[in-house]
A protein has these predicted regions:
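Domain-level signal for soluble alpha/beta catalytic cores
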Residues: 1-396
Length: 396
């Protein structure tokens, strides 16, 4: 894994804005013979765009993960269910929607009017099948097995082809965590722990395919922290949350067995929804568990207004030797464009706290499907410009 040895490197979390024609092809469930040539071309273009905007460590924009509308918060996890056997759609679960997941959320009680308005807007947006809402009805009813070999190899080959001749430092690909997968209902395994372990066994095949292709594997695990708001915040149950999170760390490490740590980066965030986030658990309550994940780099939110102050945690929490922190220094949570000098300030704070060689500048979360494409690319440009300013200060 590349490090910031002589300058601050830049990357992002994964999702980038999809071309309009690609979104339409996914939305229309176009046949592979029509979709795949467009997908391959789009990946080639997005790799070049990342390089043009100054991103050092690039990916395929997650274009192989189907987005059926321009604004889509769920493609990063919903992509995997067509790659897993063992699920069936139950209409009674689908009708419950996301609300069935957030039964323990103090925030959703305190801001009930806001969330009711958000739900109404989401229902309107989902007309025509443009949302992932029906996926909430998927239920595990049989042994979970990975069946996505062809899909992940397609994505791998598209990225390899796109990188040919490109002036790129390094490339990564994303895959979802067991903790996120186990949120959907289970009607087969005896308990949630057995269910999670089975998911870890299944998804490890995708992890290994990415690493075997010589890409950096990024595991996306928002659930490791945002589950606190959904399931534990009503009773302020930090102890119960930590017990749950500790098991999830064991599960992801099980999935990572045999994969070198220096080929893995691990991403957490507090969810992509544009809400108050008052119920978010603090990084201080989970950082020790985070650092037990067998990854070399940890990708965290640090640019949004609810979590920016948490850089100070690293004054008292030692980043283990050889590890890398990829803090988000531009945010998906706002359309306001970060000034490059602010980006530089954020980078420098981390660099002076944990060492400049241990910092890579990143984004809070994926930008595709969260903000308008023009805003997304402008944020990546600000990220690159800010990293250059930080480099001048740190290496002067």
């Amino acid at each position: 894994m590349k490090r910031s040895t002589d300058r601050i490197l830049t990357t992002h979390v994964g999702s980038l804005p999809r071309p309009k024609d690609l979104v339409e092809l996914y939305r229309d469930n176009s046949p592979d013979s029509t979709l795949f040539p467009h997908l391959r071309s789009a990946v080639a273009e997005v790799v070049q765009e990342q390089a043009r905007f100054g991103i050092d460590i690039v990916n395929d924009g997650e274009f192989g993960k189907a987005m059926r509308s321009a604004m889509d918060f769920g493609a990063w996890w919903s992509y995997v269910y067509p790659r897993l056997a063992g699920y069936e759609l139950r209409e009674e679960e689908a009708k419950k929607g996301r609300g069935a997941w957030t039964f323990g959320s103090k925030e959703r009680k305190e801001f009930a009017e806001f969330y009711a308005a958000e739900a109404s807007a989401a229902a309107t947006a989902s007309q025509g099948g443009t949302s992932t809402a029906r996926l909430y009805g998927l239920t595990c009813t049989a042994p979970v097995n990975y069946t996505g070999q062809a899909a992940i190899q397609r994505d791998i080959q598209n990225l390899k082809s796109a990188l040919t001749g490109a002036q790129i430092e390094e490339a990564f690909m994303t895959a979802v965590s067991p903790a996120t997968l186990q949120i959907l209902p289970n009607a087969y395994y005896k308990d949630r722990e057995e269910y999670t372990w089975a998911l870890a066994e299944a998804i490890r095949e995708e992890y290994r395919a990415i690493v075997d292709a010589r890409f950096i594997l990024q595991i996306d695990d928002p659930a490791l922290v945002d589950i606190y708001d959904w399931w534990f915040s009503m009773n302020d149950d930090i102890a119960g949350f930590r017990k749950w999170a500790a098991f999830q760390v064991e599960a992801v490490n099980h999935a990572l067995e045999g994969i070198p740590e220096d080929r893995v980066r691990f991403h957490i965030c507090w969810g992509s929804w544009h809400g108050p986030h008052k119920g978010d658990v603090g990084l201080k309550d989970v950082v020790d568990l985070l650092l037990k994940v067998k990854a070399q780099a940890y990708v965290i939110e640090a640019g949004n207004v609810r979590h920016e102050h948490e850089w100070k945690i690293w004054k008292t929490t030692k980043l283990p030797e050889g590890k890398v922190l990829i803090p988000g220094v531009v945010s998906h949570a706002t359309n306001v464009l970060e000034h490059p000098e602010l980006v530089a300030d954020r980078v420098v704070r981390f660099a002076k706290t944990i060492g400049r060689e241990n910092v890579i500048a990143g984004t809070d979360c994926g930008l595709g499907g969260r903000v308008h494409p023009q805003i997304a690319w402008a944020k990546l440009e600000a990220l690159s410009e800010g990293a250059k300013l930080a480099t001048k200060e740190l290496w002067s």
